[in-house]
Amino acid sequence: MNNKLTERQILILKAIINEYISTATAVGSKIILEKYFNNEVSSATIRNEMSVLEKEKYIEKPHTSAGRIPTIKGYQYYEANLAETKISERLKQKLMAILNKRYHSIDEVIEQSVEFINNVTNLPSVITKFKSYDLLKRMDLIKINNNTAIILIVSSSGEVIKKTIKYQNSIQYNDVSTCVQIFNDRLVDTPFIELKEKLTAIKEIVRTKVHEYEFVMQRIVNYIFDINEKSTINIKGTKKLVIHPEFHDHNKLSEILNLLENTSIWEQISFMQQKTGKSVITFGQDIGIEGISVASTLIETEQNKHQIAIVGPNRMEYGKIKGLLNILKEQVEKIDHLNLPLEEINKES
């Protein structure tokens, strides 16, 4: 902890931030004295300690109130030293009940769980999926008519990518069918990020098996595997932003909405987060937008990486949100590792 702060100053700082998180109203010495010190010290003592905290830039006085609010330095100290990473047993059981349900994919588990976290925090979220970690699981060819077919590319996360192929005759259709068979034989379980390299290695095999090699290369190989390897983002709960007074200003609201859609920001946070492996708090000033905080975790399964970020004002419940994200990360990675529904995992523990 910071040696400059006494135990009493730390208690007062914690009280101010807890009150401000709950009420969004500047905090005066009277509420601190009555609620946190049970009138056991004088009001002058509380005011003096608050003056020290203000001088050290942990709190500040807003223009419209006689009370005090936390500064970014105060929030950073609170998050690092005072916010308890825990949630109530009732909240934990509700999240576990969602995780216990049977889903078709890890993506679905994450989406349903994050929607629950949105609702209990009244904050929006960003789910970033790093696509390059997906594996090719299967390719299917569906003939639509005499000159059109659809190729379905199924990924390890359950995503189905559809590609329409135009051809002129049965020879070209047969070439397409041959290619799909070769790809299923030789490319299944290849990460999408490695497909181009693997395709280079099997080009000569394709050349010996098809009649119109140039058609195959232009219309199938280059077209089908022109799959976006960049991360994709899924934003949930943006309407919840207007609940918070910090975002009543239209310019500030527009700024944070632009942030939510900025893929590079989430990649930047993910890069910083990989050093810790835990749920972390990133303050807005570190990513170029003041007045917000981002609580995030990185879920690493065998085949994919998902970053879950909860976005809100600095006045967010850090411990509660980190507690929820920690449970989500731990349980999803356990489900993936054991390849079992959570209810069966819990029977073994």
Swiss-Prot record:
Per the UniProt entry, the signal peptide is none
User: Recorded GO terms, molecular function?
Assistant: DNA binding
Pfam families cross-referenced by the UniProt entry: HrcA
SUPFAM superfamilies for the chain: GAF domain-like, Winged helix' DNA-binding domain
Recite the UniProt keywords alphabetically. Answer: Repressor, Stress response, Transcription, Transcription regulation
Q: Name one GO biological process term.
A: negative regulation of DNA-templated transcription
The cysteines covalently paired via disulfide bonds are none
Query: What superkingdom heads the lineage?
Result: Bacteria
This chain's function reads: Negative regulator of class I heat shock genes (grpE-dnaK-dnaJ and groELS operons). Prevents heat-shock induction of these operons.
List the NCBIfam families: hrcA
In the record, the note on similarity to other proteins reads:
Belongs to the HrcA family.
Q: What is this protein called?
A: Heat-inducible transcription repressor HrcA
Q: Which taxonomic lineage is given here?
A: Bacteria, Bacillati, Mycoplasmatota, Mycoplasmoidales, Mycoplasmoidaceae
